[in-house]
Regions:
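Non-catalytic accessory segments adjacent to catalytic cores
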Residues: 115-159
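A conserved beta-strand-loop-helix scaffold within acyl/acetyltransferase catalytic domains
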Residues: 12-72, 76-88, 140-162, 172-276
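Aromatic (often tryptophan-rich) hydrophobic motifs at membrane interfaces
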Residues: 72-75, 99-101, 106-108, 115-123, ...
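Active-site/acyl-donor-binding loops of N-acyltransferases
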Residues: 12-23, 82-85, 150-172, 299-350
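Short, high-confidence coil segments that cap the C-terminus of an alpha-helix
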Residues: 62-64, 129-132, 241, 296-299
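Conserved acyl-donor/pantetheine-binding loop and adjacent beta-alpha core of acyl/acetyltransferases
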Residues: 82-103
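Short terminal hydrophobic/aromatic SLiMs and anchors at protein ends
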Residues: 7-8
Length: 350
C-alpha cells in the first residue's frame, strides 16, 4: 500500500511526501530551497552536494533545490537540481530551465536505487515543471539507469557523447598527439606559465576574460562572475574545485575551472585569448593544466562536461580528443512543460 503523510516542518521545506516503494519502511521526500535549512548529509558526489547548493544559492540567476529521501530520520538518497534563465535565438527567447547533473546519490545498498530514483524524479517533475520550460538530466554516469522512470514521467532521450581522459595507466603526456605536444612545448618556451588561482583579483580577472571568450559563442551559457569565486573558495577543507590560470608576463590569457568528485575530475569551463596570443596556445594550456594536476593528485579520470551531439560536427569535442581522451555514447533526458511539444518530441525520439 502507499502511505501518504504531508506536513510542513519549516517554511522553506515546501513539500514532504511519504511513499512505500515496496520497502519495509516508508520513504519520506523533503525539498530544501534554502541552504541554512539543509541538515548534515552523507555523500561524496559534488554535483549533489550541499556545497554546490550554496554556490548556486549565492549566485545571481540560479535557484537550487535539493530533494532528500529519508527512511525514518536516516537519509538514503539525494538529488540536486538548479533552475536558471536561458536565452534562446528562437521563441520563447528567454526561458527558465532546470538542470540536473547525473541521477542523484544514494547511500543504502539495501534499497532499490531505480525505484527510489523514480519517486524522486516524479517529485522533482511536479515541483519544477510549473516554473521551468525545460528539465534536462545531463552527464549521466550510467545512460541506462532510470530508463523506466524517465519514460513513466514522459521524458525523452537524445543520444549524446562523453569524452574522458584516463589518468591511471600512463602519463598524460604519452597520450597526447604529436601536434599537441609541439604546441604545449612551444607555448611554455615562449613564456606562458600555468598556475592555480590563489587570490580574489586573479579569479575576477579570469572570470572577465572567460566571459569575453564565451560571449562569441551564443549557445554557451556563462554564469555570473561571482560563481567562480564562490566555487573556488567553498569549503577549503575539501578539494571541490580549482581555477587554473594561463599567464603571460603577468597577464591572464587563459584558464579553466575544474571540479573534483570521488576519483574523477570534471572540466566545466575553459577558454583563452587564442586570437590575440595565438603563439602561446592559451586555450590548449587551459586544458592541459587541470589534466596534469589531476594526474599528479592521483585522480583516475578527467571528464569534459559537454562533448556534444554524436551526429553533429563539434569543434570542442575534436579539440579535446587530441589530448588523448576517448569518447563513448551516453544520453540526456528532457521534459518540456508544453504538453503538445513534449508529446511530439517523445514520438520523434522514442
Amino acid at each position: 500500500f502507499i502511505f501518504l503523510h504531508k506536513y510542513t516542518t519549516r517554511m522553506w521545506i515546501d513539500k514532504q511526501k511519504t511513499i512505500n516503494l515496496q520497502l519495509e519502511m516508508p520513504v519520506r521526500l523533503s525539498t530544501y530551497r534554502k541552504g541554512n535549512a539543509i541538515p548534515p548529509l552523507p555523500g561524496t558526489n559534488i554535483f549533489h552536494s550541499t556545497e554546490l547548493f550554496h554556490v548556486f544559492e549565492m549566485t545571481r540567476g540560479y535557484e537550487p533545490l535539493l530533494i532528500v529521501a529519508y527512511i525514518g530520520n536516516r537519509p538514503v538518497g539525494k538529488l540536486l537540481a538548479v533552475i536558471r534563465k536561458s536565452v534562446r535565438l528562437f521563441p520563447p527567447a528567454i526561458i527558465k530551465r532546470c538542470e540536473i547533473y547525473g541521477t542523484g546519490e544514494y547511500f543504502d545498498e539495501a534499497q532499490n536505487k531505480e525505484d527510489l530514483f523514480g519517486e524522486i524524479l516524479e517529485h522533482l517533475t511536479n515541483e519544477v515543471l510549473c516554473k521551468s520550460f525545460l528539465i534536462e538530466f545531463r552527464n549521466l554516469e550510467n545512460p541506462l539507469f532510470g530508463y523506466k522512470a524517465f519514460r513513466k514521467n514522459n521524458y525523452f532521450a537524445i543520444n549524446w557523447l562523453r569524452v574522458r581522459n584516463s589518468l591511471h595507466s600512463k602519463a598524460p603526456y604519452e597520450r597526447l598527439s604529436m601536434s599537441r605536444r609541439r604546441q604545449i612545448n612551444k607555448a611554455l618556451r615562449n613564456g606562458a606559465i600555468m598556475e592555480i588561482a590563489d587570490n580574489e583579483k586573479d579569479i575576477q580577472d579570469f572570470s572577465r576574460m572567460l566571459k569575453k571568450a564565451y560571449s562569441s559563442q551564443i549557445r554557451k551559457h556563462f554564469p555570473d562572475i561571482g560563481f567562480f569565486r564562490l566555487l573556488a573558495w567553498q569549503n577549503p577543507e575539501k578539494e571541490l574545485a580549482k581555477v587554473f590560470l594561463v599567464k603571460y608576463k603577468g597577464k591572464i590569457i587563459g584558464g579553466s575551472i575544474c571540479l573534483f568528485s570521488k576519483e574523477s575530475a570534471y572540466l566545466w569551463f575553459s577558454g583563452g585569448m587564442r586570437k590575440t596570443y595565438a603563439f602561446l596556445y592559451p586555450g590548449i594550456l587551459a586544458v592541459w593544466a587541470p589534466i596534469t594536476y589531476a594526474y599528479e593528485k592521483g585522480y583516475a579520470h578527467l571528464e569534459f562536461m559537454d562533448a556534444g551531439l554524436p551526429f553533429k560536427k563539434h569543434g570542442y569535442r575534436d579539440f579535446v580528443l587530441r589530448f588523448g581522451g576517448k569518447q563513448s555514447s551516453t544520453r540526456r533526458w528532457f521534459r518540456f512543460s508544453w504538453k503538445w511539444l513534449n508529446k511530439l518530441l517523445c514520438k520523434f525520439y522514442i
